Amino acid sequence: MSLKSRKISGKEYYLLNNEFYTGKVEITYEETGDLKTVGYFYEGLKMGEWYYFYEDGATERIENYLYGELSGIYMSFYKNGKLKEIGQMKNDKMDDMWYIYYENGNKQYENFYYLGKQSNGIWREYHENGSLKMECPTMSGYLYGECKEYDEKGYLIRKCFMRDSRKNGYEIEYNRSGKEISRTNYVSGVEMKD
């Protein structure tokens, strides 16, 4: 079976013999014949769950489609089978909470999205050992508010105020005993000299 694709009104449609294709599709790796992709089309559009596999047969990712657009749970995996990324999609855009993991299984990032943009909430990044690395409030897609950065042992090492994802105000660095070791002033992301 040889499907052809065609963009119509911004959506990717798949046709077989110039007709919108409805049915299951299985794509294999040419070299081995092992399964690469399994999914379903409805009237030329991707529909429902689609599975993608590594050459060794392990699941690479699972995507959900609604009339040709990513919509619903999205998951991707490392070759070792551990979860790499999970989140919601809506209208082909990230929507709701998203989590990204290190290959060892510890969380790397978490963030809240609304239709593809960082939404209001807290953006968090973690060290590979699982300890919190950085947290920043977000507003309307921008880092906005007091951001804090920690070392792998959990000690606060830096904090600064962000406005529109740019440093604005003092950035303060600390040693492990919590004593201030430097202070730098920023205005709209530009360091101000004393």
Regions found by a protein language model. Name each.
Residues 1-194:
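Glycine/tyrosine- and acidic-biased, solvent-exposed loop/turn segments at the edges of beta-strands
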